[in-house]
Swiss-Prot record:
This is Non-structural protein 1. The gene is NS. The keyword rRNA-binding does not apply. Inhibits post-transcriptional processing of cellular pre-mRNA, by binding and inhibiting two cellular proteins that are required for the 3'-end processing of cellular pre-mRNAs: the 30 kDa cleavage and polyadenylation specificity factor/CPSF4 and the poly(A)-binding protein 2/PABPN1. In turn, unprocessed 3' end pre-mRNAs accumulate in the host nucleus and are no longer exported to the cytoplasm. Cellular protein synthesis is thereby shut off very early after virus infection. GO terms for molecular function: protein serine/threonine kinase inhibitor activity; RNA binding. Residues 205-230 are annotated as: Disordered. Residues 1-73 are annotated as: RNA-binding and homodimerization.
């Protein structure tokens, strides 16, 4: 196993532990708590994939961070922070919409690279909007936290989420997954539109319905999604 993969996991575990302590002291806002929950799932998936114990990794990560901090001068730390571009966290969904449990009458699921697409194929003839919580950097989507499809009545009928075992995805991965989700929902004569925030940062071009036109590849994936069982 690559030692850098192990040390990266160890440091991520320790930093999550620090953030959890911050949350326990009620010092974190909604986006902070949102990322904390999502990262916990990601770490569990990575730990299972790597065969590493999270508690042991956390202790090792603490030693790595402490060693670095001892070697780091205050001036060097300031320069490093100043040179790192800041990302922004954008929220279409409320905390309740983000954390709400939902179920499907006719569940369909597809894994597209590092993303999991889920939708309820029982939904027909509905007006649906896609909302997402994500971070952006340089005016481009950086990390998708969660995307969900809502009916006008507020019911959740679809979702795109990162796979905990495959961390890391690109804006293009998200764009392709959105195309597959839209295609699957439109198959049953639903009308789908995308939130303005997601439309602005997830892609640059869209049609008059507020969503990107499907590529031939996305249409093929859409057809495969309709036929695939969970």
């Amino acid at each position: 196993m690559d030692p850098n993969t192990v040390s990266s996991f160890q440091v991520d575990c320790f930093l999550w532990h620090v953030r959890k302590r911050v949350a326990d002291q009620e010092l974190g806002d909604a986006p902070f708590l949102d990322r904390l929950r999502r990262d916990q799932k990601s770490l569990r998936g990575r730990g299972s994939t790597l065969g590493l114990d999270i508690k042991t990794a956390t202790r090792a990560g603490k030693q790595i961070v402490e060693r670095i901090l001892k070697e780091e001068s205050d001036e060097a730390l300031k320069m490093t922070m100043a040179s790192v571009p800041a990302s922004r966290y954008l929220t279409d969904m409320t905390l309740e919409e983000l954390s709400r449990d939902w179920s499907m009458l006719i569940p369909k699921q597809k894994v597209a690279g590092p993303l999991c697409i889920r939708m309820d194929q029982a939904i027909m003839d509905k007006n649906i909007i896609l909302k997402a919580n994500f971070s952006v950097i340089f005016d481009r989507l950086e990390t998708l936290i969660l995307l969900r499809a809502f009916t006008e009545e507020g019911a959740i009928v679809g979702e795109i989420s990162p796979l905990p075992s495959l961390p890391g995805h690109t804006a293009e991965d998200v764009k392709n997954a959105v195309g597959v989700l839209i295609g699957g929902l439109e198959w049953n004569d639903n009308t789908v539109r995308v939130s303005e925030t997601l439309q602005r940062f997830a892609w640059r071009s869209s049609n008059e319905n507020g969503r990107p036109p499907l590529t031939p590849k996305q249409k093929r994936e859409m057809a495969g999604t309709i036929r695939s069982e969970v």
